[in-house]
Amino acid sequence: MKRLLLIDGNSLFHRAYHALPPLTDRSGEMANAVFGFSNMLIKAIGEIKPTYIVCAFDTRAPTFRHIEFEKYKATRVTPPPDLYPQLPKVKKVLDAFGIVYFEKEGYEADDILATLAKKFQISNFKFQIVILSGDRDVLQLVDGDVKVQMPGWNLKETTLYGAKEVKEKYGLEPHQMVDYKSLTGDPSDNVPGITGIGPKTASQLLQQFHTLENLFDHVKETPLKVREKLEVGKDIALAAKRLMELDRSVDLKFEIGNLKFSPDWEKVRREYEGLGFKSIVAKLPQSVHSSQLTACLPARQVHRKKKTVNREPKTNNSDQLKLV
């Protein structure tokens, strides 16, 4: 079966920056986000062995969610000045791998991933789809053909979410995650939920009533204290759902055949040699005829005051991705 890897570029970019200490490339510019992003990308390629890869990024332009709710993501702090100057280098790495990436004003990377997953699911081919993201919003996309691989904050470990894993953690089916977050809110995006309705209560309500709309249709069947909270917060929750639900109909122009993953490893090697990431170069296939990547996390290279410190983490083989 063909395997598609969908990458949440912004999520991985931010996670890499905050997970790793300061690191400069050969030119002396900050590159810890580039290094960490590359770690996660190479690890995923080695484990999943995708037939196709696509990456998606946010743009700096407002989205339809900002228009709907002016305070959307308003509480997020100003990004560090050395973060976004690294983004062009991440995209250059993707270019070296031959990986296509999409970005579209008015939409977030998650919307693009949702659209791509849908388009591949309804194509003439059968795909196993893995979404690589640290954003739990994409859990709503999980179904029989779609799984989410979520890297840990240390970048070493990953958690694979299928429908079973989502239910074990939240007590809900993946498609209920939108309604769940509509009830609880999402502080990271500054989206309010219903005051007094926490994760446990939200999960219990959706286990009983299945959808947000059905819950409000049968609100009189809930305990009095819960009912009062639901009645007061109904409009808030319904508005939150419009923000939480990913758009699966973004207008994207592409041909599936152009997204096939077939890298020129010599080009990839030259890109990382140019950056001075020696430990990553060591993980690449040794010849253009080999496709074997070392899936473990490469060594950290931290350049401070012209000194290089290499710390090789212990290899953990227990988190190898299993696709069934």
Predicted regions and their residues:
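Non-catalytic, usually N-terminal nucleic-acid engagement modules in DNA/RNA processing proteins
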Residues: 1-54, 58, 65
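Extended two-metal-dependent nuclease catalytic cores across DNA- and RNA-processing enzymes
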Residues: 23-24, 74-249
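RNA/tRNA-interacting regions in translation and RNA-turnover enzymes
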Residues: 49, 98, 300, 319-324
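Intrinsic disorder
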Residues: 120-127, 252-254, 259, 291-293
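Long, charged alpha-helical interface segments
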Residues: 244-270
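Long, highly charged low-complexity segments
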Residues: 269-287, 305-307, 317-324
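Cationic, low-complexity basic patches in intrinsically disordered or flexible, solvent-exposed regions
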Residues: 287, 293, 313
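Short Gly/Ser/Thr- and charged-rich N-terminal loops/segments
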Residues: 293-305, 316-317
